[in-house]
Amino acid sequence: MNIHSFLDKDTETFTHVLVDEASKHCAIIDPVLDFDPAAGKISYDNANNVIGFVKSQGLTLDYIIETHAHADHLSSAPYIKAQLGGKIVMGKYIDKVQKTFKTIFNFDDLATDASQFDILTEEGSELTLGDLSITAMHVPGHTPADMAYKVTDKSAGKEKIAVFVGDTIFAPDVGSARCDFPHGSAEDLYDSIQRLLALPDDTLLYLCHDYPPKGGREHIATVHVGEQKLRNIHVKQGTPKAEFVRMRNQRDKTLAMPRLILPSVQVNINAGELPKPEDNGVRYLKIPLNQLS
């Protein structure tokens, strides 16, 4: 098992490429589509970097995995699928998110049965990538549909585990994901994080985002479970649930909405597909007013 991480500095999002070296098959986790909201311009620099890597290594893409419907960047999953193949994977509870935002955006024709995605996962779902086993973990809290993916590699004789955690836990000096989106829950997030922290201390957690403190360190893509248990500023080992929930809810009240939440969510709940062109050939995003506090 090899994992290569690509950072989009604009949204501070990591796209990870999981590779089974024996079979040369791979999966891409949380791919980013570049979007300039002021100009209404999309571009593919991040996606092309990942595509170029996959091609240069002679890899076959099996899966494009979304850990959840992101609110901070648009997904490039359809673009990558068109270039490399692969199936788009999402947690089955995305249907709840679709139903909520279909109303907010007043989308008449948005299917809310998650049928836009190729593979739907739930707790315990298994994906096979060569000699690697990918197990889905339902980790609600940030949204009701969040999934983490635990990868197990037994090919070297000793079991090796890595987990793509999505928006659950961040670097130790950053803490945890917000829970104030529709159907988010600090109580659920605490329970989800405890499941991750119950893994062996040497398990590598692959982060979806990193937000280094100003004037501090470089971005990091991975953290060991043991380090999280010792140092996470929100939820280190021994943090009571009530204390975490109180902190998380109070902190969320101070946070502004992500700057790309409205463009991102309407695209990402539709498996990354952009709106269809109108009769003038132009695609348009919708911006509902006063719908998110």
Question: Which residues are covered by each model-predicted region?
Answer:
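Active-site neighborhood of phospho(di)ester-bond hydrolases with catalytic His/Asp-centered motifs
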Residues: I29, L61-A69, I88-K92, H138-G141, ...
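Divalent metal-coordination and catalytic microenvironments
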Residues: L18, D30, H68, I80, ...
